[in-house]
């Protein structure tokens, strides 16, 4: 658990005052700590960009509410897996969290469109979409789940890495590539001419080493952190997926904040947006550092030509047919 916890003496003093009533407590025993303590769930370790942003959020909330509200960040999955966290938030058991888009899309299918491959040309376009009207529409839609969308976090851009060099779409034909547990990701691999394999993340290194799979896909940070470069030293920088993550509040938490002070919900929203900007900066720094380190180690990086990238885009275009009802939304995204 991260964050500075309330002292045991203060807790005991508060408990005593609650049990005996304010009249029974002297001024020296009055509880002077936060009036509201809220829990924030994060499944990444403390040094990860999203967790660092959660800690920044907690500090901002404490500062802007003048110490009246304290957010305690529980990192490393201490409060449960993401699916469990989402469910707990819906009934107010957890107050804040950072969750992946794929998990939320299980409950809010409209979000699935943001997982389509090659949806954006580059990162600036994605942030124009998410920080603009379209992103706000998606955040507002979370109200149907009793959740409040605060901001969008960066989760990097995903590319392929393989045991043998891949330079073109044709080179992917027949390869077995590990993907996340996602029907959409599996369909993408099939459309690209390869075979999808759903391997537990912790086993990907061994599967690559033992030639059970020919490659996998992920972002630079994960590629470096998991040591996959040692057994798959060829990185195809195709950037097929830019899938953001979300920082959320429970509606129950926002109601408690409003009861304490009507200004606090807006303060929380502002802190969410500011912490998201900090997360994006930190992610960009870590991503650049990881890529630099991998290149120095000897990873061979292939960047697709404009013509070759167009072939990749064309290959997955059939996936968009399943989103015919959202064709206007997709057009708005591509024109952003």
What is the role of each PLM region?
Residues 2-6, 12-124, 134, 142-336:
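N-terminal secretory/targeting leader peptides
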Residues 126-130:
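A gly/proline- and charged-residue-enriched helix-loop-helix capping module
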């Amino acid at each position: 658990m991260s964050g500075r916890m309330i002292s045991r003496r203060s807790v005991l003093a508060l408990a005593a005052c609650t049990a005996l009533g304010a009249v029974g407590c002297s001024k020296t025993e009055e509880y002077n700590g936060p009036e509201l303590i809220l829990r924030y769930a994060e499944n990444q370790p403390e040094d990860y960009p999203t967790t660092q942003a959660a800690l920044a959020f907690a500090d901002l909330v404490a500062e802007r509410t003048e110490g009246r509200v304290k957010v305690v960040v529980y990192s490393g999955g201490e409060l449960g897996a993401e699916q469990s966290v989402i469910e707990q938030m819906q009934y107010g058991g957890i107050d804040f969290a950072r969750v992946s888009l794929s998990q939320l899309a299980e409950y809010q299918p409209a979000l699935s469109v943001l997982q389509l491959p090659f949806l954006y040309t580059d990162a600036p376009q994605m942030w124009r979409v998410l920080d603009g009207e379209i992103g706000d529409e998606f955040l507002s839609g979370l109200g149907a789940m009793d959740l409040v969308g605060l901001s969008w976090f960066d989760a990097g851009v995903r590319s392929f890495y393989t045991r043998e060099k891949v330079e073109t779409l044709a080179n992917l034909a027949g390869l077995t590539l590990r993907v996340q547990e996602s029907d959409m990701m599996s369909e993408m691999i099939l459309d690209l001419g390869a075979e999808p394999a759903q391997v537990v993340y912790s086993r990907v290194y061994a599967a690559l080493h033992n030639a059970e799979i020919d490659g996998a896909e992920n972002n630079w940070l994960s590629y470096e952190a998991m040591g996959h470069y040692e057994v798959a030293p060829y990185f195809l920088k195709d950037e097929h997926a830019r899938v953001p993550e979300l920082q959320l509040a429970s509606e129950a938490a926002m109601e408690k904040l409003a009861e304490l002070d009507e200004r606090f919900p807006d303060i929380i929203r502002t802190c969410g947006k500011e912490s998201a900007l900090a997360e994006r900066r930190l992610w960009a720094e870590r991503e650049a550092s990881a890529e630099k380190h991998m290149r120095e180690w000897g990873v061979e990086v292939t960047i697709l030509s404009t013509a070759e990238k167009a072939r990749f885009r064309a290959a997955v275009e059939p996936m968009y047919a399943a989103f015919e009802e959202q064709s206007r939304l997709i057009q708005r995204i591509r024109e952003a």
